[in-house]
């Protein structure tokens, strides 16, 4: 874990119900990362999307040339330096990424479709409406636009396939048992021996289905600023937000800018908030920092100085990557360079995801 409060983080990811909210409130009062950068309660709320819709933003293909930061980071170890490190060149193909985090409303609609149509998708966790809802219950008017939480990486893999089948047909499902066994993964609990089948998921990027972003895709979308050099550094042909700042912020993490773009423990009132209330980043993406941590596809690994194309992470690792910070944690956890990981069967009231897919 990259923070000095690593035990608190591990605890938070397993917290349930009122206990999580009480402890989060105490931490927010006692350990607020930067007391003067809370920002407003949120920028103007964007127009409400149509029922259950999920908007995507187009990301053009790019080649990113890694750069070593010449400015201070929240910590000294490599987990603060992101994936575009000095000596590494990353080529990304075009992709689409969700404008918002996946809401509980959308999550639940797919679960209901699965049940109503006997599609056979099996989840280890039913999901929760934000940080304080009832697991698996019907969405409420007040909380349906909050991010889904309490879902594991394995749940996300299976749900992505279910959503793909619902919207595009089962043939476009991304996550398969292996490159040679193209069985669609439908069961977050299934094992072969002692190994969960989902943990060996093969991502068929030739399909058009919904999926988790790779870590490189996530970070590029969080940091992209085009030719705008404000609070950014040139990485080859593109400017990327500095590693010590939140996504969309115009200054580093310990300034008021963090509170303008992110919900964290200094302004969240110890809970999640409806997606899209904070100012978007340069690509029009909301909540890339704060509100909930977001799962990525990759196994966590040390980043090597090499040339790679569309990297998907290591073949195995200590845990699956999650990025971005959350309502429960500190302003410095919202920085776009921070990397962390946890077991793929973990879940928490501050852990969710957003979607990606290849056009």
Predicted features by range, described:
Residues 91-258, 301:
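Active-site microenvironments of metalloenzymes and redox enzymes
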Residues 115-123, 257, 261-263, 310-311, ...:
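Proline-centered structural pivot motif
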Residues 1-13:
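N-terminal secretory signal peptides that target proteins for export/translocation
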Residues 197-205, 253-289, 340-343:
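Short, well-ordered junction/capping motifs at the entry into regular secondary structure
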Residues 57-58, 96-101, 147-150, 211-213, ...:
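Structural recognition of the beta-strand scaffold that forms the well-ordered cores
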Residues 88, 238, 248, 271, ...:
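Surface-exposed recognition segments
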Residues 60-63, 96, 101, 152-155, ...:
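Short, flexible loop/turn elements at secondary-structure junctions
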Residues 2, 21-114, 153-193, 223-229, ...:
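Short, compositionally biased
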């Amino acid at each position: 874990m990259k923070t000095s409060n690593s035990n608190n983080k591990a605890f938070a990811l397993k917290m349930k119900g009122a206990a999580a909210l009480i402890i989060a409130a105490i931490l927010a009062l006692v350990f607020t990362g930067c007391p003067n950068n809370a920002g407003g309660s949120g920028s103007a709320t964007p127009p409400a999307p149509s029922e259950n819709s999920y908007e995507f933003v187009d990301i053009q293909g790019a080649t990113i040339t890694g750069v070593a930061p010449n400015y201070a980071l929240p910590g000294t170890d490599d987990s603060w330096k992101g994936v575009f490190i000095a000596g590494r060149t990353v080529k990304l193909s075009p992709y689409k990424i969700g404008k918002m985090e996946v809401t509980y409303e959308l999550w639940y609609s797919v679960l209901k479709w699965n049940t109503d149509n006997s599609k056979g998708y099996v989840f280890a966790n039913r999901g929760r409406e934000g940080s304080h809802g009832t697991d698996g219950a019907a969405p409420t008017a007040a909380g349906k636009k909050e991010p889904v939480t309490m879902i594991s990486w394995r749940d996300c893999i299976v749900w992505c396939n279910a959503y793909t089948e619902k919207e595009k047909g089962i043939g476009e499902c991304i996550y398969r048992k292996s490159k040679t066994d193209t069985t669609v993964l439908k069961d977050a609990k299934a094992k072969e021996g002692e190994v969960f089948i989902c943990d060996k998921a093969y991502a068929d990027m030739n399909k058009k289905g919904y999926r988790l972003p790779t870590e490189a895709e996530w970070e590029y979308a969080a940091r992209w600023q085009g030719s705008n050099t404000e609070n950014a550094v040139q990485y080859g042909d593109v400017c990327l937000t500095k590693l010590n700042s939140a996504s969309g912020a115009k200054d580093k993490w310990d300034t008021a800018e963090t509170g303008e773009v992110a919900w964290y423990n200094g302004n969240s009132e110890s809970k999640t908030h409806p997606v899209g209330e904070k100012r978007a980043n340069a690509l029009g993406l909301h909540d890339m920092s704060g509100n909930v941590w977001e799962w990525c596809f990759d196994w966590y690994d040390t980043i090597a100085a090499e040339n790679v194309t569309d990297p998907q992470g290591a073949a195995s690792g200590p845990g699956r990557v999650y990025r971005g910070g959350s309502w429960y944690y500190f302003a410095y956890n919202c920085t776009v360079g921070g990397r962390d990981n946890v077991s793929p069967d973990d879940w928490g009231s501050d852990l969710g995801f957003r979607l990606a897919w290849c056009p």
